[in-house]
Amino acid sequence: MSLNSALYPPVTALNAFGVGTQVSAHNLANVLTDGFKAGRTTYMDLPRYSGVQAQVQTGLGPTGPLIPVQGLPRDPATPAWVPEGFVEGSNTDVATEMVNLIVTSRGYQANAKIIPTVDSMLGTVIDMKV
């Protein structure tokens, strides 16, 4: 077992869960932004060292709720399906994003604990060889 192959999976998982946390935080920061489409993170296994990679997809999901506005001119960027006097709200679901944050933080914590364990195991192996 080489040092690279032992540490590669938890390090890539830390990176992937960090990306997932950033996406959820971005979605929550824009929960009140009209027309915002929440991003989603999917995780893929990497074949060579069985690491993890995060893929971010933005601008997905259902339409947001229609919010009535009065006295504002129609924004040219507003989709044609939105009636006059309304704007499309954000499609971010706060409950879903909070659950995603909990999952990603627990995954991050678990993989962060793997690194000192691998370090200790490799230290034991080195001590046995000496």
PLM-predicted stretches and their roles:
Residues 1-130:
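Amphipathic alpha-helical polymerization modules
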